[in-house]
Amino acid sequence: SSIKKDELEKKWKQNIELNPVFINKKLIFVTADWKVVALNSDDGSLLWELQALYMPSRRGILVENNKKLNLEILYIPIGNRVYKINANNGKRIKEFGKNGSIAAFTLVAPMIYEKKLVVVNMNVNTFDINSGKIIDTIPIHLIKKNFGGGIPWGGVALDSDKGIVYANTGNPHPAIIGINRKGKNKRSASVVAIDLNKRKVLWDFQETAHDLWDFDIPSPPIIHNLKKNKKIYEVVISVTKTGNTIILERNTGRPIFDITYKKAPKSSIPGEITAPFQIDLNKPEKF
């Protein structure tokens, strides 16, 4: 049955700036004034808080339920580091990295793959989950790219069975004006698949070539098994600013539905060379 307005009452309130995580009756989140806070989810009472000196990431906290240590652990990006924190008391786990943190900037939540911590910025970096020692660094972008930016700020996803990270990348910089970054600016405003075991980019699919409109992809990829014409496809799905729902095969990056290309308008700005064509997705229907 539906819930009526008079059946609801305010229980408690806190100001937050990201999706909270819930662990064993603890609600943990980041506040606008750079605090990491843990509340009792039943009554909203404060369990612990950690005041950060630098801005914590607003796009995710990783939770590890470590059964070996019988401990719930948080991995929180703050400033240019990722901190490993005991979820029960808010204290750093000092055996990790340098005094409980590693030098690794990221805008999105880390991930765990085979006892490795995966941290994504302009590279896909892996660290030993216990010591924090760097294991590997896999570049997302080409070495000879002619633009800045392109960091995956909207989110990433991990197919732990395949060992593949999927990243939705940001727009190329300088944004809006592309006179000094001619060409498609490959792997910007794109879905990119990175194989952790093969240590390379498997494929990339660019939604907006030579982006001049801030059309980078703001949402995290979604890993899904899609049924189409009585066949199951392993796909990764990305919802974009332009209203597209990009659905690609996870292994190959091939679109599940046919795509076409439409002619793009030319720029009136001297020296600006726009991409002559942009992809046009007809299915699924645009938002």
Specify the residue positions occupied by each region the protein language model found.
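Repeat-blade elements of multi-bladed beta-propeller folds
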Residues: 13-35, 54-81, 105-124, 148-180, ...
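Short, solvent-exposed loop/turn and secondary-structure capping segments
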Residues: 32, 39-41, 86-88, 95, ...
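Phosphate/diphosphate-binding loops
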Residues: 222-268
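Hydrophobic/aromatic beta-strand positions that recur at structurally equivalent sites within the blades
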Residues: 39-40, 64, 85-86, 127, ...
